[in-house]
Amino acid sequence: MPLSPDGPIATHLAGVPERERAVLTAIVDRVLETVPDVGEKVSYGLPTLTYRGKAILSAVAAKKHLALYPHSGSVVAAVADDLAGFSLSTGTIRFSADRPIPPEIIDRIIALRMQAIDEG
């Protein structure tokens, strides 16, 4: 399902410099290719992609970094060993345009979030 051109994802990406926007857009595109019936909303003040009405992830630009929020601390813990050298906290993965999150890790995050949402 295409996202709204004036929705929260497009609005956020429009204000991001081109280099960073390309990295964030790649994450959004991966979700759109993988997740059926993707939606969008604002959750915790972040533009958020949804699955079955629940937050699957947010990928945003901050002042000094890019960040991925999988809206689940257990997901970050599950992929932490594969993200050595990235700045991690309970619910956040910080990265940059120079060092994006590898696509296979994005795929794992998506799969883990979908599983958690499906299991309710």
Where are these regions (language model features)?
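Charge-dense, helix-prone N-terminal extensions
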Residues: 1-120
